[in-house]
Amino acid sequence: VEWTDKERSIISDIFSHMDYDDIGPKALSRCLVVYPWTQRYFSGFGNLYNAEGIMSNANVAAHGIKVLHGLDRGMKNMDNIADAYTDLSTLHSEKLHVDPDNFKLLSDCITIVLAAKMGHAFTAETQGAFQKFLAAVVSALGKQYH
């Protein structure tokens, strides 16, 4: 992936202001509510029976924060995102057997929650850079499936 200086700056700025404790839980919760088939990977998380249960689930919140912090790896390795996620790709494909299409669904939910949080500051240019970044991460996470 080729990055312009402007894209690097946008990604860096997003992560320097990221509210992990707010955006992470909301993004994962949204994914589990909007795409209920993704819940099958979280059977040990307790109450996932309805939106209220998911949104108030401490395990979902904690994992959402963990997932969002996982994006730090890509931000710190923008010139080599694919290699930065080799171990996580292997884990999700070989041990957890996660459908790689779910990474895209979650990335869309992260984008929606971030856009809502940033408001007018989430310009088309910001969205373009952020979605390019997430697409690179999603591709890297799916690498071991091929």
From Swiss-Prot:
CC per GO annotation: blood microparticle; haptoglobin-hemoglobin complex; hemoglobin complex
InterPro entries recorded: Globin, Globin-like_sf, Globin/Proto, Hemoglobin_b, Hemoglobin_oxygen_transport
Binding site for heme b: 63, 92
Tissue-specific expression: Red blood cells.
Gene Ontology MF terms in the entry: haptoglobin binding; heme binding; metal ion binding; organic acid binding; oxygen binding; oxygen carrier activity; peroxidase activity
Residues covered by the Globin domain: 2-146
Keywords, comma-separated and alphabetical: Heme, Iron, Metal-binding, Oxygen transport, Transport
One record GO biological process: hydrogen peroxide catabolic process
General remark: This fish has three hemoglobins: Hb1 (major, about 65-70% of the total), Hb2 (about 5% of the total) and HbC (about 20-25% of the total). Hb1 and Hb2 display a very weak Bohr effect and no Root effect.
Quaternary structure (record): Hb1 is a heterotetramer of two alpha-1 chains and two beta chains. Hb2 is a heterotetramer of two alpha-2 chains and two beta chains.
Entry's family note: Belongs to the globin family.
Function as written in the Swiss-Prot or TrEMBL entry: Involved in oxygen transport from gills to the various peripheral tissues.
Protein name (record): Hemoglobin subunit beta-1/2
Provenance organism: Trematomus newnesi (Dusky notothen)
